[in-house]
């Protein structure tokens, strides 16, 4: 009974670690509407939101994976 619960917890943490970076990525790429009194420039914005935050989300994914694997190794 205890091993099954720990295995489910580990798989849940792994699933959360895989889905969390996609949620962060989707929130960063949302586009806000422009106010009517501003000019829209044709040049692209150099600080693109898709290039930020990739390392930290990968690092948190690796950390959660290591935590879940260590819990599985400890209890199973």
From Swiss-Prot:
Q: Which membrane topology describes this protein?
A: Lipid-anchor; GPI-anchor
Extract the signal peptide range: 1-26
Compositionally biased tracts (Polar residues) = 37-51
Main location per UniProt? Answer: membrane
Q: Which residue positions carry a glycan here?
A: 27, 30, 39, 41, 43, 48, 51
Q: Name one GO molecular function term.
A: Hsp70 protein binding
Q: Where is the lipid attached (GPI-anchor amidated glycine)?
A: 53
Localization per record: Cell membrane
Q: How is it modified after translation?
A: The identity of the N- and O-linked polysaccharides is not reported in PubMed:1530634. The O-linked polysaccharides on Ser-30, Ser-41, Ser-43, and Thr-51 are probably the mucin type linked to GalNAc.
Taken from the UniProt record, the cysteine pairs bridged by disulfide bonds within this chain are: none
Instruction: Supply one GO CC term from the record.
Output: external side of plasma membrane
Q: What happens when the gene is disrupted?
A: Cd22/Siglec10 double-deficient mice develop autoimmune disease, which is not observed in single-deficient mice.
| Site feature (Not glycosylated) residues | 45
Q: Which GO terms describe its biological process?
A: apoptotic mitochondrial changes; apoptotic nuclear changes; apoptotic signaling pathway; B cell apoptotic process; B cell proliferation; B cell receptor transport into membrane raft; calcium-mediated signaling; CD4-positive, alpha-beta T cell proliferation
Tell me which tissues or organs this protein is expressed in.
In lymphoid, myeloid, and erythroid cells.
Disordered as annotated region, ranges: 37-57
Question: Keywords in UniProt for this one?
Answer: Cell membrane, Glycoprotein, GPI-anchor, Immunity, Innate immunity, Lipoprotein, Membrane, Signal
User: Which ranges are cleaved off as propeptide?
Assistant: 54-76
Q: Which PANTHER family match?
A: SIGNAL TRANSDUCER CD24 (PTHR16676:SF0)
UniProt lists the family membership as follows: Belongs to the CD24 family.
Q: What does the function comment of this entry state?
A: May have a pivotal role in cell differentiation of different cell types. May have a specific role in early thymocyte development. Signaling could be triggered by the binding of a lectin-like ligand to the CD24 carbohydrates, and transduced by the release of second messengers derived from the GPI-anchor. Modulates B-cell activation responses. In association with SIGLEC10 may be involved in the selective suppression of the immune response to danger-associated molecular patterns (DAMPs) such as HMGB1, HSP70 and HSP90. Plays a role in the control of autoimmunity.
Subunit structure, per the record? Interacts with SIGLEC10; the probable CD24:SIGLEC10 complex is proposed to inhibit HGMB1-mediated tissue damage immune response.
Q: What's the protein called, per UniProt?
A: Signal transducer CD24
Which taxonomic lineage does the organism of this UniProt entry have? Answer: Eukaryota, Metazoa, Chordata, Craniata, Vertebrata
* Gene name tied to this protein: Cd24
């Amino acid at each position: 009974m205890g091993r099954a619960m720990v295995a489910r917890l580990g798989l849940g943490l792994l699933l959360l670690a895989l889905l969390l970076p996609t949620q962060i990525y989707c929130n960063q790429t949302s586009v806000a509407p422009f106010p009517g009194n501003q000019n829209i420039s044709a040049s692209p914005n150099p600080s693109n939101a898709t290039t930020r935050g990739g390392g930290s989300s990968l690092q948190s994914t690796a950390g959660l994976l290591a935590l879940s694997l260590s819990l599985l190794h400890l209890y199973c």
